[in-house]
Amino acid sequence: MDTKTLIASEIAKVVPELEQDAIFNLLETPKNSDMGDLAFPAFSLAKVLRKAPQMIASELAEQIDESQFEKVVAVGPYINFFLDKAKISSQVLEQVITAGSDYAQQDEGQGRNVAIDMSSPNIAKPFSIGHLRSTVIGDSLAHIFAKMGYKPVKINHLGDWGKQFGMLIVAYKKWGDEAAVQAHPIDELLKLYVRINAEAETDPTVDEEAREWFRKLEDGDKEATELWQWFRDESLLEFNRLYDQLHVTFDSYNGEAFYNDKMDEVLDLLEAKNLLVESKGAQVVNLEKYGIEHPALIKKSDGATLYITRDLAAALYRKRTYDFAKSVYVVGNEQAAHFKQLKAVLKEMGYDWSDDMTHVAFGLVTKGGAKLSTRKGNVILLEPTVAEAINRAASQIEAKNPNLADKEAVAHAVGVGAIKFYDLKTDRMNGYDFDLEAMVSFEGETGPYVQYAHARIQSILRKADFTPSATTTYSLADAESWEIIKLIQDFPRIIKRTSDNFEPSIMAKFAINLAQSFNKYYAHTRILDDNSERDNRLALCYATATVLKEALRLLSVDAPNEM
């Protein structure tokens, strides 16, 4: 139990008028540590108890069980709690040393599934930095949900269907070179895609031709299907090479095409429930009662189905297949209206489990303030970017530690980790401007900064030849140690907050805070001095490294032992 929860529970025992959660949220940290570690303001009880806050504070301070604390005192309208730092630090260090990387493991999920729709690049288009956000946010959430006791199911809902394949077939038939595509599939397909879109802006017949080829593809035309399959196979080979570099895996690659034969059931269900309404020749579902002005367009007047029809089929399939406790869609914020419609249509169909679906939206990645666009050829491709990040990391490692063993593997961990961490430390609803130099810096709020703090601790532990004993009691009560202990003790709550809010930036900011607190401690404390506190300080180092490494793992970032 963390200290805030402990205090809230003790106050709740003597204040039945307030819920423990309400008490927890009212607790404050005094500006001056001389006034205690945490304080409860009695103002909120004045109306209920019909007494002055000062009197309430004084009376309650007398009733609270002090055995858990150093002391409890009333100061004006506040009850100030002074924590028994030696006792708490001993408990926290024992928990981390005993549990190791399992420290803060929770059982909220009880093994239930969480479906995570993530990454989902478009076939025959390059994997750009724009796709990175969905990939790394989804991968981090998968680790977080597992830490909360759920079983994550990572689904790469590939963009392997749609009019763009009509465009690509037209482009390939006009200008394609089979040998060139086989040699450099994504590069060549991107050139074709950009070229055909540029031509379509001045020639309206291109769109008509593309629509015709896509119709052929839908009808199972042999030539169209073979080209589509080839584009898909070549793209997947390239994507999987990139996923290997990022250390990201998936449980399913069922993309849009997988649901081609599952949409008729959706239409039948909607018709059976009398939810389809004709509007200008199209079939729609009205959603005004959900506060959604625009109806969901299920089927166009030409009989073509739409994304929402496919996503309805996917939602039904995933519920039946995984019986998920949560279904999470890590997709850009521009799709917010689509996911509101999706949930509302499922609700109209009588599926209350739609309440368990969440659109985990995120902001845009820009470059020099400009929006990225595959269609216009304005993209930052991931593969060369990762290579450059690794090279930059290698240069810094060479300068700092030229004799480091396994430099290549460490440079990979630092370079890839830097890109992931920079993305994840940003509140997901905010966008960010892509700046590789800032990402790979060993200074500031970066992945390499946190990784370096972890490596520094491992170096200290190696130098001291220290391994903590689960049967030894370690405790510290000094101010610098206490700052670290408080953060380590807060780790379970940070994991829960990250999970509840689908917000990996909470975890990334925690990792930065812990690394900063340790570096401050390192600067002011002679850790290896041979005195009575040495083992206690080394136990704190061990616990800090354990939690830092686990925090980075939850962000899908490696923590090298040497850098």
Swiss-Prot record:
UniProt-annotated location(s): Cytoplasm
EC number(s) given by UniProt: 6.1.1.19
GO molecular function: arginine-tRNA ligase activity; ATP binding
This protein's UniProt keywords: Aminoacyl-tRNA synthetase, ATP-binding, Cytoplasm, Ligase, Nucleotide-binding, Protein biosynthesis
Motif, 'HIGH' region: chain positions: 121-131
TM region positions: none
Signal as UniProt keyword: no
An annotated GO BP: arginyl-tRNA aminoacylation
SMART domains: Arg_tRNA_synt_N, DALR_1
Keyword Aminoacyl-tRNA synthetase in annotation: yes
Organism domain of life: Bacteria
Assigned GO CC terms: cytoplasm
InterPro entries for the chain: Arg-tRNA-ligase, Arg-tRNA-synth_N, Arg-tRNA-synth_N_sf, ArgRS_core, DALR_anticod-bd, Rossmann-like_a/b/a_fold, tRNAsynth_Ia_anticodon-bd
Reactions performed catalytically: tRNA(Arg) + L-arginine + ATP = L-arginyl-tRNA(Arg) + AMP + diphosphate
Subunit structure: Monomer.
Similarity-based family: Belongs to the class-I aminoacyl-tRNA synthetase family.
NCBIfam families, A to Z: argS
Name the record gives this protein: Arginine--tRNA ligase
